[in-house]
């Protein structure tokens, strides 16, 4: 192959966002600034990797049908260490992309890694891809109808995400340079293992090109408020007049609940505001400091001037979780986890807090707890939910409709039970997203460490058999909660890696699975009503209620099977030389699912027995040869954040002669 290689490393330039971050780091820490500069291409490549993987699987601009695998020896002049390369044709752009393949996995996923190369098909020259936007340019030439406001925004998103990816991985390289132990050991030995696990997920979503999106924040704010930088955050407390708010709580009224959650704080606030105000006329709301500085004093100044919203001088010391807007105290503090509104663009959406979230959270908790208590099928599984105990949002009935919704969503608080109130001392809690994480000085992910521990504790002969037993225990707990809920009650929990907390025993096995965050779940309204649970008291703007059985199924399957179990199984398989291990682990998941469905059929509780036809319909869809896959990149380019786009992919749960 006669190619004239052109390498551009010598002319690598910062874009504006990278330059601003670099200047911030030069002022903050010159060593960090140097590492940031050295890792620019690595950070960009991690976002390019997500873009290429998703466009191929989604067949965006025929990236899958116009691709093929080639041997790396066919391009011996390139710096590629893998055996195979993914070649993707862009015929309209007259360019060809080369992406080194690191693995092929379930649901038609091909994993790639940088460096990536683009060949100009006219001049026959190859250049190294320096930024994911070079790939986006090819996409838009292939599909000019996608060149619009959404793609313009996506272009800026990729710049922001790549900058923050480098920001994050360079901090990890700096802060952990003296560490060498497996990441799980570091998490386990931390004062607060759960919080440390949230902070360990440096790269964000494993598949989303906007994994590190933080639009709306400058470098200093990103450093202060993002989980990976481990900074304490002083949450602001405001009093909001009862006539300008709506509240909901799980058992006792909102004020009583908050008083029980923060007894010392209430005394401090009473001393601060009495006798200036009638404390009983106000509700307590927690506000993110960025939201207070950026939004409160601009959009709510009239209410502040009238003392209908009052800022307290007291603050709460919290830390950001992986999701940015969910914050937690550091152990041994037992105050609640708090989900807040933030007008920051993260992973494709502005993360305000909808009215339905603060209203429906406690209501959903009440329904789920009632189901879990009364339906014996759940007694067999080591899984439960984390209560959302109270919520509040701003509400001015005098505001016009759209303006009213906007202002309500910008000022809201949801309180969630602290995980340490739910678990025994001898287990280690962590967010499952961290199970697949690594760091530069030890590439053993926590899930591999846990399996090795189990192998040793159980005196098993090899890693592969240990992995199969580990996956069986884990998937039984996860699916034993999700599948009966969606099948019997039409409730599809969004149980992806980020929406769970898992606790592990000393022998490495899962102890209990806890599912949290009910904002993104979906409910088959008719099915839940048929099971004698009313939805009439849900928020009038509820997006979680639907008549679409497909929407409900896809929500449960994508989050739980494709994302949650899919990432874990993929990571385990990469740690083994057995090319059949991934397939065999999916067989185990299929067996676990078969057993759960059998238990559903055998249920003797006539009062809440599900129709067997419904069970068979769900089984037929779940075990079909092809299954829907959510197209995250296509949705961003089509500006369809709330209307999901799917493509059919091969289903690893399918067996001939089902």
From Swiss-Prot:
> Could you mention a single GO BP entry for this protein?
siderophore biosynthetic process
Uppermost EC category: ligase
Pathway per its UniProt entry is: Siderophore biosynthesis
Provide the leader sequence positions: none
Gene3D superfamilies in the record: 1.10.510.40
Q: What is its EC number?
A: 6.3.2.58
What GO molecular functions are on record for this protein? acid-amino acid ligase activity; ATP binding
Q: Name the source's superkingdom.
A: Bacteria
Arranged from A to Z, the UniProt key words for this protein are: ATP-binding, Ligase, Nucleotide-binding
> So what does this thing catalyse?
D-ornithine + citrate + ATP = N(5)-[(S)-citryl]-D-ornithine + AMP + diphosphate + H(+)
| PANTHER family associated with the record | L-2,3-DIAMINOPROPANOATE--CITRATE LIGASE, STAPHYLOFERRIN B SYNTHASE
What does the similarity note say? Belongs to the IucA/IucC family.
Role played = Involved in the biosynthesis of the siderophore staphyloferrin A. Catalyzes the ATP-dependent condensation of D-ornithine and citrate to form a citryl-D-ornithine intermediate.
Protein name (Swiss-Prot/TrEMBL)? D-ornithine--citrate ligase
What is the name of the gene encoding this protein?
sfnaD
């Amino acid at each position: 192959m006669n190619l004239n290689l052109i390498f551009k490393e010598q002319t690598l330039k910062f874009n504006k966002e990278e330059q601003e971050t670099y200047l911030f780091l030069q002022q903050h820490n010159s060593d960090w600034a140097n590492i940031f500069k050295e890792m620019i291409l690595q950070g960009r490549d991690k976002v390019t990797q997500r873009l290429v993987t998703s466009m191929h699987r989604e067949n965006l601009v025929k990236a899958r049908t116009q691709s093929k695998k080639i041997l790396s020896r066919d391009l011996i002049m390139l710096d590629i260490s893998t055996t195979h390369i993914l070649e993707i044709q862009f015929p309209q752009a007259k360019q060809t992309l080369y992406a080194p393949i690191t693995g092929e996995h379930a649901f038609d996923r091909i994993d790639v890694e940088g460096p990536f190369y683009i060949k100009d098909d006219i001049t026959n020259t190859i250049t190294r891809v320096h930024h994911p936007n070079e790939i986006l340019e090819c996409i838009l030439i292939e599909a000019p109808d996608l060149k619009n406001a959404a793609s313009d925004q996506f272009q800026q998103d990729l710049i922001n995400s790549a900058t923050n990816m480098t920001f994050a991985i360079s901090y990890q390289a700096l802060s952990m340079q003296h560490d060498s132990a497996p990441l799980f050991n570091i998490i386990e030995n931390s004062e607060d293992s759960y919080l440390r696990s949230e902070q360990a997920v440096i790269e964000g979503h494993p598949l989303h090109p906007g994994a590190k999106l933080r639009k709306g924040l400058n470098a200093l704010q990103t450093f202060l408020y993002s989980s990976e930088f481990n900074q304490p955050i002083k949450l602001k407390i405001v009093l909001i007049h009862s006539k300008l708010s709506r509240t909901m709580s799980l058992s006792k009224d909102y004020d009583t609940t908050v008083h029980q959650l923060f007894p010392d704080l209430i005394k401090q606030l009473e001393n601060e505001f009495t006798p200036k105000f009638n404390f009983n006329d106000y509700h307590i709301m927690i506000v993110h400091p960025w939201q207070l500085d950026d939004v409160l004093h601009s959009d709510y100044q009239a209410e502040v001037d009238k003392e209908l919203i009052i800022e307290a001088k007291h603050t709460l010391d919290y830390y950001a979780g992986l999701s940015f807007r969910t914050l937690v105290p550091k152990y041994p503090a037992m105050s609640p986890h708090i989900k807040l509104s933030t007008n920051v663009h993260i992973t494709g959406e502005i993360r305000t807090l909808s009215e339905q979230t603060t209203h429906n959270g406690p209501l959903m908790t009440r329904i789920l707890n009632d189901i879990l208590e009364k339906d014996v099928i759940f007694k067999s599984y080591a899984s439960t939910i984390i209560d959302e105990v109270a919520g509040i949002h701003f509400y001015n009935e005098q505001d016009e409709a759209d303006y009213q919704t906007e202002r309500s969503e910008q000022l809201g608080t949801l309180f969630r039970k602290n995980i340490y109130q739910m678990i025994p001392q001898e287990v280690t809690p962590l967010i499952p997203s961290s199970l697949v994480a690594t760091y530069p000085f030890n590439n053993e992910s926590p899930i591999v460490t846990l399996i090795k521990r189990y192998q040793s504790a159980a005196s098993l002969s090899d890693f592969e058999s240990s992995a199969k037993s580990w996956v069986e225990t884990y998937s039984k707990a996860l699916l034993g909660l999700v599948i009966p809920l969606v099948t019997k009650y039409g409730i599809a929990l969004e149980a992806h890696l980020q929406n769970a907390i898992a606790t592990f025993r000393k022998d490495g096995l899962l102890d209990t699975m806890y599912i949290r965050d009910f904002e993104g779940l979906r409910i088959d309204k008719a099915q839940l009503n048929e099971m004698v649970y009313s939805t009439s008291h849900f928020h009038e703007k509820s997006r979680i209620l639907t008549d679409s059985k497909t929407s409900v199924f896809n929500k449960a399957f994508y989050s739980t099977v494709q994302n949650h179990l899919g990432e874990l199984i993929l990571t385990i398989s990469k740690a083994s030389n057995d090319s059949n291990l991934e397939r065999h682990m999916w067989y185990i998941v299929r067996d676990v699912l078969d057993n759960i469905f059998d238990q559903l059929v055998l249920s003797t509780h006539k009062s809440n027995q599900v129709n067997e036809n419904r069970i068979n319909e769900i089984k037929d869809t779940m075990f079909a040869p092809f299954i829907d896959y959510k197209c995250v990149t296509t949705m961003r380019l089509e500006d369809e954040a709330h209307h999901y786009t799917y493509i059919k992919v091969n289903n690893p749960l399918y067996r001939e002669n089902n």
